Regions:
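A conserved acidic beta->alpha catalytic loop
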Residues: 27, 38-47
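A short, conserved alpha-helix in the catalytic core of glycosyltransferases
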Residues: 142, 147-150, 154-159, 163-192
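Conserved donor NDP-sugar-binding/catalytic core segment of glycosyltransferases
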Residues: 94-126
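Short, well-formed alpha-helical segments that are part of the catalytic scaffolds
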Residues: 12-30
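Glycine-rich, basic loop-to-helix element that forms the pyrophosphate-binding segment
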Residues: 60-78
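A recurrent flexible, glycine/aromatic-enriched loop bordering the glycosyltransferase active site
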Residues: 132-150, 203
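Short aromatic/hydrophobic "clamp" motif used to bind/position activated sugar donors
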Residues: 83
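Non-catalytic, C-terminal membrane-associated alpha-helical segments of glycosyltransferases
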Residues: 210-218, 229-287
Length: 287
């Protein structure tokens, strides 16, 4: 019988993340297969990583697929029962997998997702959502997407992630759909993960504009999908007029960066309301 730790394949979606990916890979046991989906046409990354790490397969997507679609591509190549979704700017602790295995045994494999605990107050979970089954394992409504173990045997979606979402709320959407089917999601408090937000895909101003555009697009799409038109429209109405006010103010004070940021936020919201795809990419942005 295959052991728990040997039944895990790591899936990492990258976008020119060579400056941080090495530490991530080195934190993973060399006996585990790692599938990296590189959301670019950079074949030099594939050659460099595969020459250095024999347990790694780098798939060049040829375009920027985004987080959800990229992970779906990686998961489609997984042959083990478990897929560990990991961001390139995250790395695991020496006890991470051992503590997840302890939780897996405690839960008797009756879970859809278990996730390690971010060492600095992982996420913003409300205590009212916790169901204490032990001091170390907590049932939650959602976990953060930068590190989570999927039990593929217990997830029955044709596409794990919603591929209409390019960035933001993809894991929240997945957790919501799992909970709607009475699936179980747990946070393992003693299983630690370390994460440096936003380092994985760069931090240029163009990237920030892209992130703000997609935040507004995804927020409206998620609310419409899971909460209905009334809540989606109510939130959109407030966001729309707040963005208009901020745009006007930034013009008055001649703050170009704030103007562009709020203009892109407004654009993302409008595109989502009009049911247009989440098309914008950092390389499309011209300042």
């Amino acid at each position: 019988m295959i052991s728990f730790k040997d039944n895990i394949t790591f899936v990492i979606v990258t976008f020119n993340s060579q400056q941080v990916i090495t530490k991530c890979i080195e934190s993973i046991n060399s006996n585990n297969r790692i599938i990296i989906i590189e959301n670019s046409k950079n074949y030099l990354i594939k050659k460099s990583i595969e020459n250095k790490f024999k347990n790694v397969e780098v798939v060049i997507a040829g375009e920027n697929l985004g987080y959800g679609c990229g992970n779906n591509l990686g998961i489609s190549k997984v042959k083990t029962q478990y897929a560990f979704i990991l961001n390139p700017d995250a790395y695991i602790d020496e006890n991470t997998i051992q503590e997840l295995e302890t939780a897996q045994l405690l839960l008797k494999d009756k879970f859809s997702i278990i996730a390690p605990n971010f060492y600095n107050n992982y996420g913003n979970f409300s205590k009212k959502n916790y169901i204490d089954i032990s001091r170390k394992v907590l049932e939650v409504d959602f976990v953060k997407g930068f590190a989570m173990l999927l039990n593929l045997k217990n997830i029955n979606f044709r596409s794990i992630f919603d591929e209409k979402i390019f960035l933001f709320l993809e894991e929240i959407d997945l957790c919501k759909r799992i909970k709607n089917q009475n699936g179980k999601i747990y946070l393992v408090s003693d299983s630690k993960i370390y994460h440096s937000e936003k380092k994985g895909s760069g931090s240029s101003f163009e990237v920030e504009l892209c992130r703000n555009w997609h935040w507004m697009w995804s927020l409206y799409y998620y609310n419409l999908k899971h909460s209905g038109k009334f809540k989606a429209y109510t939130i959109a109405f407030n966001k729309f007029f707040l963005s208009i006010i901020k745009i006007l103010f930034s013009l008055i004070v001649f703050n170009k960066k704030k103007y562009l940021m709020n203009r892109y936020r407004l654009s993302g919201l409008v595109y989502s309301i009009l049911n247009k795809p989440s098309w914008i990419r950092p390389e499309n942005i011209k300042i």
